[in-house]
Amino acid sequence: MAISKKSSLFLPIFTFITMFLMVVNKVSSSTHETNALHFMFNQFSKDQKDLILQGDATTGTDGNLELTRVSSNGSPQGSSVGRALFYAPVHIWESSAVVASFEATFTFLIKSPDSHPADGIAFFISNIDSSIPSGSTGRLLGLFPDANVIRNSTTIDFNAAYNADTIVAVELDTYPNTDIGDPSYPHIGIDIKSVRSKKTAKWNMQNGKVGTAHIIYNSVDKRLSAVVSYPNADSATVSYDVDLDNVLPEWVRVGLSASTGLYKETNTILSWSFTSKLKSNEIPDIATVV
């Protein structure tokens, strides 16, 4: 059968369009398989619109994030609490029981004129409308409400006191508050809905030196792990198995929190990055900040 000149021109065009649509369809399918969020702050500007600052937290001082209050000459102040949360929610799990894996890293500088720095920094995950609990300065790290527990009580119900329904945190605790279950030394710990850590490890905090905290959640093993280190020094490592869909709501925000009390320290964040990945049939919500 003879093919007209017009038909011979149409066939290559039709073939090209068909192949193009196949490629587009393939790309779209693979994109929908992953719901991801990524951000990275190598420095912090004075008007950092993609952070939700709470309490005494400020940005822009030498390109850093100051979580707790400092004076005009940079000296730390007592009884301060501050938090910074990333503006975009994180899809941490979905109804099909798929849970996201995530990784967070931040560099920090804790400096204190006191012989006992206090009280520490925490990376935390909470509900999207999370705010600083009342009375959460000092040992409560800006994460847990003050339950007014009688200090001379010989028994403390930790299931009812100093807890929060939707908090998962990794704490860098510079001051041991043994009356609420802390070990008798500075430590890192994993907190699940309570200031009393599920697991702790001794931490040799170095006053005035830059350290790095690296946090990983493996959704396959359901293991939350953290490593805190300084250059040319031994690292502190802690891990705990937790199923996040039993602890957290489906959508959460991630943040950094810090507090001071009677004793004080600077709680300075120099950089912060976060990546999460959830296998899903939904279109991904990806935010990137450099």
UniProtKB/Swiss-Prot annotation:
GO terms for molecular function: D-mannose binding; metal ion binding. Mn(2+) binds at residues 171, 173, 182, 187. Ca(2+) binds at residues 119, 173, 175, 177, 182. Residues 1-29 form the signal peptide. Glycans are attached at residue 152. The mature chain consists of residues 164-281 followed by 30-148. To form a mature chain the precursor undergoes further post-translational modification after removal of the signal sequence; cleavage after Asn at positions 148, 163, and 281 is followed by transposition and ligation (By formation of a new peptide bond) of residues 164-281 and 30-148. This maturation (circular permutation) relies on the legumain AEP1 activity and leads to an increased stability of conA after heat stress and at various pH. Belongs to the leguminous lectin family. This is Concanavalin-A. It comes from Canavalia ensiformis.
